[in-house]
C-alpha cells in the first residue's frame, strides 16, 4: 500500500498529477483544489489511497489525512465508489462535508453531480454518527496554475468529468470568466463549482 508520495511534480492535468519519487512517476488522481496547490517542477507531498481492482490500481491523492479519511468513509456508503467520493470532495470541502452530514443537510449533498436526494439521505443516515463536525485546523490549499489549453476549455472538461452536463459546465465557465477574465484555471474552476452548487 502506498500511503503517501513525495517528489517532483512532472505533470499537472485536469484530474491528476504525475509525481516522480525515487525514479518512478506516480499518476495520482486528485480534486481541482488539491491540484491547484501543486506547481510543475516543484516538490510536493500528497497523502494517498490506493484502490485495487481486478484490472487496475489507482492512486488518489489528498493534501492531508483528514481528506483521505473522508474519502474512505464516503465509500462505506452503498453506491458510492472512488469517483463519486472524489466528486463529493471536489464540491464540498472537508468542513462543509462534515457539517452537511452531521446536520442532515441533504440540499448541500445533492450539489454533488451523481448524488440525488435518496443518495444524500442514505449518506446522512449512514455517516451522521461517524463524522466530527468541528471545524478543521488545517489551512486552505493554495491555488496555482494548471495544465495546457484555454482556461475555459479546461474548466468545462473538468466539470464534465465530475458529472455536470456539458451545457451547464459551459454556462458556468462563461459566467465565471466574464466576472474574472484573468483567473487561473484552478481559481476559476473552484468558482464554477461554487456557482453550480448554488444553482443545483
From Swiss-Prot:
Its main location: cytoplasm. Disulfide bonds: none annotated. One of its GO terms (molecular function) is four-way junction DNA binding. Keywords: Cytoplasm, DNA damage, DNA recombination, DNA repair, DNA-binding. Residues 1-63 are annotated as: Domain I. The keyword DNA-binding applies. CDD domains: UBA_RuvA_C. Residues 142-146 are annotated as: Flexible linker. It is found in: Cytoplasm. Gene3D superfamilies: 5' to 3' exonuclease, C-terminal subdomain, DNA helicase RuvA subunit, C-terminal domain, Nucleic acid-binding proteins. One of its GO terms (cellular component) is Holliday junction helicase complex. Pfam families: HHH_5, RuvA_C, RuvA_N. Residues 147-200 are annotated as: Domain III. One of its GO terms (biological process) is DNA repair. Residues 64-142 are annotated as: Domain II. Homotetramer. Forms an RuvA(8)-RuvB(12)-Holliday junction (HJ) complex. HJ DNA is sandwiched between 2 RuvA tetramers; dsDNA enters through RuvA and exits via RuvB. An RuvB hexamer assembles on each DNA strand where it exits the tetramer. Each RuvB hexamer is contacted by two RuvA subunits (via domain III) on 2 adjacent RuvB subunits; this complex drives branch migration. In the full resolvosome a probable DNA-RuvA(4)-RuvB(12)-RuvC(2) complex forms which resolves the HJ. Belongs to the RuvA family. The RuvA-RuvB-RuvC complex processes Holliday junction (HJ) DNA during genetic recombination and DNA repair, while the RuvA-RuvB complex plays an important role in the rescue of blocked DNA replication forks via replication fork reversal (RFR). RuvA specifically binds to HJ cruciform DNA, conferring on it an open structure. The RuvB hexamer acts as an ATP-dependent pump, pulling dsDNA into and through the RuvAB complex. HJ branch migration allows RuvC to scan DNA until it finds its consensus sequence, where it cleaves and resolves the cruciform DNA. Has three domains with a flexible linker between the domains II and III and assumes an 'L' shape. Domain III is highly mobile and contacts RuvB. This is Holliday junction branch migration complex subunit RuvA. It comes from Rhodococcus jostii (strain RHA1).
Amino acid at each position: 500500500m502506498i500511503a503517501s508520495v513525495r517528489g517532483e511534480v512532472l505533470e499537472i492535468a485536469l484530474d491528476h498529477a504525475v509525481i516522480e519519487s525515487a525514479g518512478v512517476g506516480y499518476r495520482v488522481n486528485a480534486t481541482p483544489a488539491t491540484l491547484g496547490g501543486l506547481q510543475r517542477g516543484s516538490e510536493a507531498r500528497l497523502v494517498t489511497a490506493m484502490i485495487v481492482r481486478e484490472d487496475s490500481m489507482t492512486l488518489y491523492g489528498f493534501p492531508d489525512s483528514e481528506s483521505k479519511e473522508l474519502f474512505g468513509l464516503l465509500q462505506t456508503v452503498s453506491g458510492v465508489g472512488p469517483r463519486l467520493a472524489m466528486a463529493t470532495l471536489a464540491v464540498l470541502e472537508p468542513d462543509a462535508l462534515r457539517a452537511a452530514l452531521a446536520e442532515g443537510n441533504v440540499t448541500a449533498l445533492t450539489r454533488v453531480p451523481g448524488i440525488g436526494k435518496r443518495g444524500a439521505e442514505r449518506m446522512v443516515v449512514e455517516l451522521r454518527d461517524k463524522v466530527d463536525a468541528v471545524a478543521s485546523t488545517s489551512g486552505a490549499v493554495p491555488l496555482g496554475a494548471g495544465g495546457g489549453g484555454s482556461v475555459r476549455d479546461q474548466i468545462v472538461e473538468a466539470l464534465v468529468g465530475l458529472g455536470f452536463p456539458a451545457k451547464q459546465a459551459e454556462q458556468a465557465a462563461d459566467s465565471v470568466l466574464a466576472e474574472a477574465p484573468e483567473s487561473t484555471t484552478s481559481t476559476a474552476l473552484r468558482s464554477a463549482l461554487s456557482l453550480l452548487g448554488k444553482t443545483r
